[in-house]
């Protein structure tokens, strides 16, 4: 047990991606690049992209319904919905739209924004709500449609991102606590390495008051700095989470990292001395889906039979902010 109130188990997962995709070969007709250039630097083969008729909340709702079905939980029994996203349909948030679409009428719903670390932050937040006894059934969703926020003329960024959603159901349990340990960090001094900033011209309203009138600019990233940051911080934060769980790397059955870049995942697993066969990767199929990437990879691994009940999973999210974190959990109830 955890020394708090209720214990926490993850009882279901689900994911959703758009049917349409853009291959590296097709992308090379849009911007100066090639399949070999992209794969050798990122490991990405294609990315699924949401049509303009598909909303972020629709993808999130599809993933949520699948997770609820696996958990055998009715939407009406959900107490809280946490939507981790940086690309909501509405700047005020999309969680309430998801709540309505899935029929979770009792649930309070709100967005969390922590970029590619968002799902992990949401999972930790859900754990704390359950452990304090506030809620018993929490739906955590990671979803992003970054295809709408990249510069499709910038080959350094447009080759990386895809759209998708993933979700898990967290429930209170009287005996088992399957959230074993976690560690979260932020460093705002490095915000310039990866951001999606609001910029514009000033608009004077009266003497002494000049507001900014503008819009959000496309995503900007310093790839080399993000790589250095991830390779240095991710192994460290996973080891800290393992320490909190009273475990070591030898106890890890699967490593489920934010699917940012295959080079990063390879470097992290090497530093943790984990064999490649323990690393779950679907980067080639989907690219970087930001907050969706961890639950999307987890869901595919569970449904394929790779991840089994009782397996210990180490996971880490890292990205804009800069934010990063690690969590250790046991799969299944």
Curated annotation (Swiss-Prot):
Paired cysteines (S-S): none
Annotated keywords: Acyltransferase, Cytoplasm, Fatty acid biosynthesis, Fatty acid metabolism, Lipid biosynthesis, Lipid metabolism, Multifunctional enzyme, Transferase
Pathway recorded for this protein: Lipid metabolism; fatty acid biosynthesis
One Gene Ontology MF term: beta-ketoacyl-acyl-carrier-protein synthase III activity
EC number: 2.3.1.180
Catalytic reactions on record: malonyl-[ACP] + acetyl-CoA + H(+) = 3-oxobutanoyl-[ACP] + CO2 + CoA
GO biological process, one term: fatty acid biosynthetic process
Region of interest: ACP-binding: 259-263
One Pfam family hit: ACP_syn_III
Location in the cell: Cytoplasm
One GO CC term, this protein: cytoplasm
Active site positions, chain numbering: 116, 258, 288
Record carries keyword Lipid metabolism: yes
PANTHER family per record: 3-OXOACYL-[ACYL-CARRIER-PROTEIN] SYNTHASE (PTHR43091), BETA-KETOACYL-[ACYL-CARRIER-PROTEIN] SYNTHASE III, CHLOROPLASTIC (PTHR43091:SF1)
Family membership noted in the UniProt record: Belongs to the thiolase-like superfamily. FabH family.
Subunit structure: Homodimer.
NCBIfam families: fabH, PRK09352.1
Function summary: Catalyzes the condensation reaction of fatty acid synthesis by the addition to an acyl acceptor of two carbons from malonyl-ACP. Catalyzes the first condensation reaction which initiates fatty acid synthesis and may therefore play a role in governing the total rate of fatty acid production. Possesses both acetoacetyl-ACP synthase and acetyl transacylase activities. Its substrate specificity determines the biosynthesis of branched-chain and/or straight-chain of fatty acids.
Domain text: The last Arg residue of the ACP-binding site is essential for the weak association between ACP/AcpP and FabH.
The name this protein goes by in its record: Beta-ketoacyl-[acyl-carrier-protein] synthase III
